[in-house]
A protein has these predicted regions:
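SAM-dependent Rossmann-like transferase core, predominantly class I methyltransferases
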Residues: 71-72, 76, 82-164, 171-183
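S-adenosylmethionine
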Residues: 128, 162-263
Length: 263
């Protein structure tokens, strides 16, 4: 686990450094250096510290992520510096992932609302969804999809985006997670296509069957869970840990799959 630096000393150094910065470009460059210096763990929606710095700084300035790069030479106001300082302190000193600080996690090209009730979207399933599971699936033949352990709803909603003629059920055992999923369904305009269900895997599905079943279930074993970097410990443990070998949920799921999958 990454050692947390002394908060009082480092917060002071962050505050002092920011007082010397003038433009958005200055803040981006310095944020990347800060992330590298403190060896922040990436992997919660960002592949490199530059992209993460852009997301954090632009969020603090109430600017969209795709703002024209020419604005990077604009000066940052004193009040804005304080907001950036506060966010950087939480990211560096507390190791809070950026997606939780901005409230947005991207998946399959879609922005999802996220908070610490759900995992931050990052499953490689997203690439398969964007390709409509080619070459294994005929997209035109897909009428129903189930997303088990849906969390934020990102996988199920992404399926709805890329299979517009399919009805999608998103199931989870966490009521907190389902609240977030429901909000994403409504905010993204999928309420006519996506249904959010409280269910322990298949238990509340009343024998329904589907053309596609997708899932990113908890898969981390107990030993690895305890050794994960601090960033991961801001996420709900229920969404990550799956027993001594990481397969508790998978073992429970597999015997039921064939009964709910259309031929």
């Amino acid at each position: 686990m990454v050692a947390i630096p002394d908060s009082s000393q480092d917060l002071l150094s962050i505050d002092e450094a920011i007082s010397e910065l003038a433009t958005i470009r200055d803040f981006l460059r310095w944020s990347v250096s800060l992330f590298n210096e403190h060896q922040l763990v990436l992997g919660h929606g960002f592949d490199d510290p530059w992209d993460e710095a852009v997301a954090l700084v632009l969020h603090a300035l109430h600017l969209p992520w795709d703002t024209d790069v020419r604005i990077q030479d604009a000066r940052v106001l004193p009040a804005e510096r304080k907001v950036i300082c506060s966010l950087l302190a939480r990211r560096v000193l507390e190791r809070v992932p950026t997606a939780y600080l901005t409230g947005v996690g991207w998946f399959a090209g879609i922005p999802f609302q996220v908070d610490q009730r759900v995992l931050i979207p990052r499953s490689p399933i997203g690439e398969l969804i964007e390709k409509q599971f080619a070459p294994w699936i005929d997209p035109a033949a897909v009428e129903s999809i189930l997303d088990l352990c849906t969390g934020s709803g990102c996988i199920g909603i992404a399926c709805a985006q890329y299979f517009p003629d399919a009805l999608v059920d998103c199931a989870d055992l966490s009521e907190d997670a389902l609240d977030v999923a429901e909000r994403n369904v409504l905010d993204l305009g999928f309420e006519q296509q996506v249904n959010v269900i409280y269910s322990d895997l298949f238990e509340a599905l009343d024998g329904r069957t589907y053309d596609i079943i997708v899932s990113n279930p908890p898969y981390v074993d107990k030993q690895d869970m305890d050794a994960l970097a601090d960033e991961f410990h801001h996420e709900p443990r229920m969404g990550l840990e799956a027993g001594n070998d990481g397969l508790d949920i998978v073992r429970k799921m597999l015997p039921e799959l064939s009964r709910h999958l259309n031929p």
